[in-house]
Amino acid sequence: MGTTKVTPSLVFAVTVATIGSFQFGYNTGVINAPETILKDFLNYTLEERLEDLPSEGLLTALWSLCVAIFSVGGMIGSFSVGLFVNRFGRRNSMLLVNLLAIIAGCLMGFAKIAESVEMLILGRLLIGIFCGLCTGFVPMYIGEVSPTALRGAFGTLNQLGIVVGILVAQIFGLDFILGSEELWPGLLGLTIIPAILQSAALPFCPESPRFLLINKKEEDQATEILQRLWGTSDVVQEIQEMKDESVRMSQEKQVTVLELFRSPNYVQPLLISIVLQLSQQLSGINAVFYYSTGIFKDAGVQEPIYATIGAGVVNTIFTVVSLFLVERAGRRTLHMIGLGGMAVCSVFMTISLLLKDDYEAMSFVCIVAILIYVAFFEIGPGPIPWFIVAELFSQGPRPAAIAVAGCCNWTSNFLVGMLFPSAAAYLGAYVFIIFAAFLIFFLIFTFFKVPETKGRTFEDIARAFEGQAHSGKGPAGVELNSMQPVKETPGNA
């Protein structure tokens, strides 16, 4: 195999794909900053329509729906990933669904002029479906165009896109930028611009070579794309690996979601994929970000919105750090470090919130604990669950597996968002102890069950799980991790 390198074609393709990740992050964070203004819009619109003041219960229900419908859309979208990628391909799927983002942006952007609550809610639903699809398309495409030795680093760019999107939404949501009563429609409708940019750039990106060879049997085109992306003429080893996988796929029928759960070959990697997605959401990160302004306010911070943006900056910086570490330390190690660090920080957050009224310094401890907590999240649990799912499965079951894992991620995201306020009201500062318990459980699970995928081909990983399924062994971390990755040579460095 020739020496692979980071080519302009590869960087361009991955960067354009991560615009979808940016959209997910932006639309996750954009609803939080103008909360008061949007509630006023709901109140005014309903008052005009009902010719009476709406009840507090109706307003609360509608606001909750505006927030939660995004996650419901995400569940629908993530579960529909396979329907698109198997029929249209990875690149063309990303191109097609941008139409959803444009329609959603128009609905949200013109909701105020039309005085329509329904347009706002429908727009949030459609942008949720779009983002759910993106959380499947982007990691899959990046994983399939990246060289084995760089797959983890490029996979982390998916998470970088998400956190940059959240940060941009937080900054643009400031009242003196777009978070004002006059400009909030522009804040929500801004999602149209990345959709148009990505639609314009995607035709210049190649289709996934794995999709072309394995699904479409277009070997010559796949070879040409691989050579251009990786900057080497010698891609014989990768092409042969894809051809072997293509032969295996031709001997099997299309893998459906139901068959994923039935086949002993897929049960263990699917379990790992689901638990890793849960480890991301049940770590408490979204609870911290959804309610960070309130947490900082409770901790005594004078300008909590700026502290929240500070957390977003830390989020972004440590995602970049993870990008450089993931191919050195490995996925499994970084994930465990992240989970362990977050568990410790959760305990410190609890202690500082309990003692802040008695000791002024505890407000500072709380802020530092949150910032370090966010840093540990981006070291492991943030980026790794997204791209490791694509690594654990071969071409056939990959779309269905990503759909199931993505749906679990969105569902747990939705449940945390719905249940955290009640849990926080009932348990107070002790609520973060629940997250600490989850984090410890996920740390133990990762140690015993999650394999190291660094430097290993998709085929190698799939065969390891198949061998264990046939021998009746579970995927204990020691067993699978005792297998050596592809030996580092100039060809895969």
Swiss-Prot record:
- This protein's source sits in the domain of life called Eukaryota
Please list the GO terms describing molecular function.
D-glucose binding; D-glucose transmembrane transporter activity; dehydroascorbic acid transmembrane transporter activity; galactose transmembrane transporter activity
Q: Which ranges sit in the Extracellular compartment?
A: 33-64, 112-118, 175-183, 291-304, 353-363, 421-429
Report the protein's function.
Answer: Facilitative glucose transporter. Can also mediate the uptake of various other monosaccharides across the cell membrane. Mediates the uptake of glucose, 2-deoxyglucose, galactose, mannose, xylose and fucose, and probably also dehydroascorbate. Does not mediate fructose transport. Required for mesendoderm differentiation.
Q: Which residues cross the membrane?
A: 11-32, 65-85, 91-111, 119-142, 154-174, 184-204, 270-290, 305-325, 332-352, 364-389, 400-420, 430-450
Which PROSITE patterns does the protein's record reference? MFS, SUGAR_TRANSPORT_1, SUGAR_TRANSPORT_2
Q: How does it assemble?
A: Interacts with SMIM43; the interaction may promote SLC2A3-mediated glucose transport to meet the energy needs of mesendoderm differentiation.
According to UniProt, the name of this protein is Solute carrier family 2, facilitated glucose transporter member 3
The record, for InterPro entries, names: Glc_transpt_3, GLUT, MFS_dom, MFS_sugar_transport-like, MFS_trans_sf, Sugar/inositol_transpt, Sugar_transporter_CS
Q: What is the lineage of its organism?
A: Eukaryota, Metazoa, Chordata, Craniata, Vertebrata
What is any one GO biological process for this UniProt entry? D-glucose transmembrane transport
Q: Residues bearing Phosphothreonine?
A: T232, T489
Keyword terms, alphabetized = Cell membrane, Cell projection, Glycoprotein, Membrane, Phosphoprotein, Sugar transport, Transmembrane, Transmembrane helix, Transport
